């Protein structure tokens, strides 16, 4: 059954590897299916391998638009065979993140490695600074992100992250529950930077950061 969503496009960060558990692959396909059921298009890192390949194929097969953003230098490594949807080749990693953010109404991280964490933490930081107010979610497959969430809680306890900024990131063990939480998300944190800051211009976001239609 199709469900109307307030999101037009969601950016998904995930590994170019599939991981060691079948549950990670299943979660990528499940998330892709959930996006399709809500008529949401996908923005992702552009690769055709690992979890990136699985979710992009699931969304594309479901009839939704797929936008892949990938640095030219990574194309030989992360693309094998045919890609699906629209592929945007960019100059570097910074431009990749900027383009992904610009085209998305929310962010979700599937399990992944250093690159996934770097992308995730950057969009969380942008939210904390007030550069955007788009929701950020973790698909916490079989507790994959429990240690990261514990670290964030420790940073709050030690005074490095404010309690309200802790609420920037939401998590859930299933795609359906996570997307519902993102739909219901309301920012609570105080924004640090001016909305007309240079960072906003760098990543190409509008001052109001409204969901694009």
UniProtKB/Swiss-Prot annotation:
What name does this protein carry? Cytokinin riboside 5'-monophosphate phosphoribohydrolase LOG1
A Pfam family that the UniProt record links to this protein: Lysine_decarbox
Q: What is its main location?
A: cytoplasm
Q: What highest taxon heads this organism's lineage?
A: Eukaryota
InterPro entries recorded: LOG, LOG_fam
Q: What is this protein's tissue specificity according to the annotation?
A: Expressed in roots and shoots. Detected in the vascular tissues of roots, cotyledons, leaves and pistils, in the shoot apical meristem and in immature flowers.
Q: Which classification does the entry list for the species?
A: Eukaryota, Viridiplantae, Streptophyta, Embryophyta, Tracheophyta
Biological-process GO terms, alphabetical: cytokinin biosynthetic process
> Which family would the database say this protein is a member of?
Belongs to the LOG family.
| Catalytic activity field | N(6)-(dimethylallyl)adenosine 5'-phosphate + H2O = N(6)-dimethylallyladenine + D-ribose 5-phosphate; 9-ribosyl-trans-zeatin 5'-phosphate + H2O = trans-zeatin + D-ribose 5-phosphate
* Gene (name only): LOG1
């Amino acid at each position: 059954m199709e469900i109307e969503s307030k999101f037009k496009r969601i950016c998904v960060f995930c590994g170019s590897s599939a991981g060691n558990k079948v549950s990670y692959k299943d979660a990528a396909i499940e998330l892709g299916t959930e996006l399709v059921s809500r008529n949401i298009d996908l923005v992702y890192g552009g690769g055709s391998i690992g979890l990136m390949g699985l979710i992009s194929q699931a969304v594309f097969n479901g009839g939704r638009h797929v936008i892949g953003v990938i640095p030219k230098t990574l194309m030989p490594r992360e693309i094998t065979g045919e890609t699906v949807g629209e592929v945007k080749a960019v100059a570097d990693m910074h431009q990749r993140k900027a383009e992904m953010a610009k085209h998305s109404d929310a962010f979700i991280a599937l399990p992944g490695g250093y690159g996934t964490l770097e992308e995730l933490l950057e969009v969380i930081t942008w939210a904390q600074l007030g550069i955007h107010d788009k929701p950020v979610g973790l698909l916490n497959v079989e507790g994959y992100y429990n240690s990261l969430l514990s670290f964030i809680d420790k940073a709050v306890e030690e005074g490095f992250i404010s309690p309200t900024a802790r609420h920037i990131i939401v998590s859930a063990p299933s795609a359906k529950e996570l997307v519902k939480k993102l739909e219901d998300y309301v920012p609570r944190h105080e924004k640090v930077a001016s909305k007309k800051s240079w960072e906003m211009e760098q990543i190409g976001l509008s001052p109001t950061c409204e969901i694009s239609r």
